[in-house]
């Protein structure tokens, strides 16, 4: 046998060993049986795939006990991760870019939403004098939590229309009944939130929508392109040290995305907690119907959409603007690709 033939045989054997190793790893249980997951505003339709995964028992089927802690907004969920009280987060993709800019590598492993569904609205009493985001100057704007992606949307539009990002004040109002109450009591001048909150406030005539990312066209109008929304992210160290646990989480979420894609709004609403409807089941079901197109069908990330998010953040966030961010390192499709092979 020639040296070349020997080398080829060794290479083939090595590939076989790798393949066997990967197959064995896939058959091995996750490194962790219990995972602590943080989320900011779980009743929001932004996070519907997470709740579907939980309610249908897909985490359990993947060999995981997932303990979900719900915080008032995404920034609080991120703080839980950084502080060590959470292992992973279901949150906005934006945070992966911001944390990399701070030399804290956070990586998104599955995309749940292909556009955000955020809506900027002014209260009815302010609607007559509103012409553009430049009129947000001096307003008190209710967001899910200070530092959350709902605040980023408002600041992006403000900077885009000649304002500074601190030309308005921001107050956290959550993403459920507390947000509705803040508007009803007139505690704020404008709001950035998601359905079902926005849909309910619209039905009551309390707000005027002025920017809407509940559709792809609206997202392009606001952000200039497709924009990643809800994702599952974790520290790079967790992903590298717990690859089977990460894969199990992704498998469960991708399974839920496939389930959602094949169901009607009525079927999806039936598995959600009744209190998420904010007292109006019919309107809630309609909100789900409107939101269904924004959920990913396969969990994959688009480089183009990720670059759009980076461009938006760089325009108003000095930390991002002053850092060298490798956008390709903020997400991975590796786990989603393996999940796609599931039956």
PLM-predicted stretches and their roles:
Residues 1-32, 341-343:
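Short, low-complexity disordered leader/linker segments with a strong preference
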Residues 26-174, 185-195, 206, 210-211:
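Short, glycine-/small- and polar/acidic-enriched structural segments
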Residues 47, 78, 93-96, 133, ...:
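Extracytoplasmic/secreted envelope proteins and their assembly/folding machinery
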Residues 61, 128, 215-225, 293-301:
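Short, solvent-exposed loop/beta-turn-alpha elements that line the ligand-binding surface or hinge
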Residues 178-274:
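Pocket-lining segment of extracytoplasmic ligand-binding domains
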Residues 239-320:
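Secondary-structure end/capping motifs
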Residues 310-343:
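Conserved C-terminal helix/tail region of periplasmic/extracytoplasmic solute-binding proteins
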């Amino acid at each position: 046998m020639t040296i070349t033939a020997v080398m080829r045989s060794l290479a083939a054997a090595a590939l076989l060993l790798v393949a066997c190793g990967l197959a064995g790893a896939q058959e091995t249980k996750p490194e962790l049986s219990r995972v602590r997951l943080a989320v900011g505003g779980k009743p929001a339709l932004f996070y519907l795939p997470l709740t579907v995964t939980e309610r249908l028992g897909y985490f359990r089927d993947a060999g995981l006990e997932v303990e979900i802690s719900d915080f008032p907004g995404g920034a609080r969920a991120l703080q839980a991760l950084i502080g060590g009280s959470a292992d992973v987060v279901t949150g906005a993709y934006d945070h992966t870019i911001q944390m990399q800019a701070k030399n804290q590598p956070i990586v998104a492993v599955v995309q749940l939403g292909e556009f955000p569904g955020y809506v900027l609205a002014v209260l009815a009493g302010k609607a007559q004098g509103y012409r553009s985001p430049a009129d947000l100057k001096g307003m008190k704007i209710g967001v899910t939590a200070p530092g959350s992606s709902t605040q980023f949307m408002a600041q992006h539009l403000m900077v885009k229309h000649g304002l500074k990002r601190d030309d308005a004040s921001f107050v956290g109002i959550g993403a459920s009944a507390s947000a509705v109450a803040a508007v009803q009591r007139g505690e704020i001048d404008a709001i950035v939130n998601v359905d079902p909150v926005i849909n309910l406030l619209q039905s009551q005539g309390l707000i005027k929508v002025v920017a809407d990312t509940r559709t792809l066209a609206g997202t392009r109008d606001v952000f200039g392109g497709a924009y990643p929304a809800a994702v599952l992210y974790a520290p790079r160290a967790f992903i590298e040290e717990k690859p089977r646990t990460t894969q199990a989480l992704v498998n469960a979420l991708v399974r839920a995305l496939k389930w959602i894609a094949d169901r009607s709004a009525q079927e999806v609403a039936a598995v959600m907690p009744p209190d998420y409807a904010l007292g109006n089941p019919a309107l809630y079901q309609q909100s789900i119907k409107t939101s269904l197109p924004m959920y990913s069908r396969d969990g994959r990330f688009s480089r183009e959409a990720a670059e759009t998010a980076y461009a938006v953040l760089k325009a108003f966030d000095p930390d991002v603007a002053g850092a060298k961010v490798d956008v390709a390192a903020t997400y991975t499709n590796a786990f989603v690709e393996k999940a796609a092979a599931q039956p």
